[in-house]
């Protein structure tokens, strides 16, 4: 079945993008910086607004950006891991969208899944960013075929 986190937008790519912008870090460097940190600063896992407030306070305290990013990745991975457990999914888990290119998030998710003993393989395809567009195109083709099929049946009924 379909499940999503009920905890605000704190697991979204937009959240990570906002934090990167606030920290003055290029989005393509976020994953590398996160993986390069030996520490992870704890971040609120309740809501994006609270997490952003945490980040503002961390910056004011002089916490290095890589530790903040690693903390954010761990927080997101923790929520995703809980979601995977609740959904009762099977391997492999394919991460799609822009977050699939964030090596820090994928690494944190793999660590979290291993720590939680979920026994799941996490896969992040090279072109995962196109998954949503491909899905939309397939859905559009399906809907167009149904609409055309229905109108043809209706025409046959009216004229036949």
Predicted regions and their residues:
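Short beta-alpha connecting loops at secondary-structure transitions
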Residues: 1-6, 91, 115-125
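A glycine- and small-aliphatic-rich helix-loop capping segment at beta-alpha/alpha-beta transitions
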Residues: 1, 108-117, 143-146
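Glycine-rich phosphate-binding loops at beta-strand->alpha-helix junctions
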Residues: 85-112, 125-129
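Short coil/turn connectors at secondary-structure junctions
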Residues: 39, 63-64, 88-92, 118-119
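Glycine-rich phosphate-binding loop plus the immediately following alpha-helix
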Residues: 1-39, 138, 142
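Adenine-nucleotide phosphate-binding core of ATP-dependent small-molecule kinases
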Residues: 51-83, 129
């Amino acid at each position: 079945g379909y499940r999503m986190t009920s905890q605000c937008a704190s697991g979204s790519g937009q959240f990570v993008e906002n934090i990167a912008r606030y920290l003055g870090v290029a989005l393509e460097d976020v994953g590398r910086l996160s993986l390069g940190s030996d520490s992870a600063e704890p971040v609120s896992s309740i809501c994006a607004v609270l997490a952003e407030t945490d980040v503002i306070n961390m910056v004011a305290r002089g916490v290095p950006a890589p530790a903040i990013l690693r903390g954010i990745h761990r927080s997101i991975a923790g929520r995703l891991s809980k979601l995977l457990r609740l959904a009762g999914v099977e391997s492999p888990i394919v991460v799609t969208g822009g977050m699939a290119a964030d090596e820090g998030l994928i690494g944190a998710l793999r660590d979290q899944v291993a720590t939680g003993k979920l026994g799941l393989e996490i896969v992040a395809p090279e072109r995962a960013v196109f998954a949503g567009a491909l899905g939309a195109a397939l859905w559009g083709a399906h809907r167009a075929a149904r609409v055309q099929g229905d109108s043809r049946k209706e025409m046959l009924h009216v004229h036949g």
